[in-house]
């Protein structure tokens, strides 16, 4: 009994150790095309290249691949895969990919040619590697990575601005202005403009002629003259007083000078003539003061030029 048991164990050990060796021998016996196109490669045997459908499926699994489908073979053919051998695909028929016609390959046909043969018939196998990322495994591809570039340009925005202001060029217009403004991009540099406005005011000098004829005989005359210049500025009053004083001094000097040469007939005649002349001068000064005050009221903002004064001396006949 023990002998039978030991014999069974010996046979089992021999069988288990021989099986991997046979598998290794089968992998070494397989031949595969040098380059894979779109993951598809042609697989056969070194001694006996032909295999039935089951053997073709097992051969792909031994290589860590799967039996390719017709669509995968067609995709490889469009990428330049071409052979002159029929091979099994997953749909249990054999195909041959052709790019150029050849009488010896696929009966001078083009494309993926199909042969519906029984599964027992022997052909090579088309295996597919799903981990391939290159079109041709023999030609490494340079992968260029494009990083997204953020667009920092602000999209242009149109907005309508309605203004109730009138056009500056047509002040009489009553139609409100409606303007459409397009906002520029942030990247574009904004243009800077400078506007210089020069306002020139041309004023015509106003000549105010003031004629002063004065001969002051008493303090009452000064009061009447001051009342006549009520609407004139203080500076003009001061100038008028100065000219009055100068005129009075000149008049006194003149009278003293000519009294010695031509004595007066009577003091009463001299006094009457002086009083008559002073009254006329006061009336003329009142008229001039009223005209000057009217001009000042009409144009209060106009520039006033310094007045021109004329001094007339009083001549008294004796």
UniProtKB/Swiss-Prot annotation:
This is Lymphatic vessel endothelial hyaluronic acid receptor 1. The keyword Mitochondrion does not apply. Homodimer; disulfide-linked. Interacts with PDGFB and IGFBP3. Forms a transient ternary complex with PDGFB and PDGFRB in TGN. GO terms for molecular function: cargo receptor activity; hyaluronic acid binding; transmembrane signaling receptor activity. Residues 24-234 are extracellular. Residues 284-318 are annotated as: Disordered. It comes from Mus musculus. It is found in: Membrane. The keyword Nucleotide-binding does not apply. One of its GO terms (biological process) is hyaluronan catabolic process. O-glycosylated. Residues 39-129 form the Link domain. Residues 1-23 form the signal peptide. InterPro entries: C-type_lectin-like/link_sf, CD44_antigen-like, CTDL_fold, Link_dom.
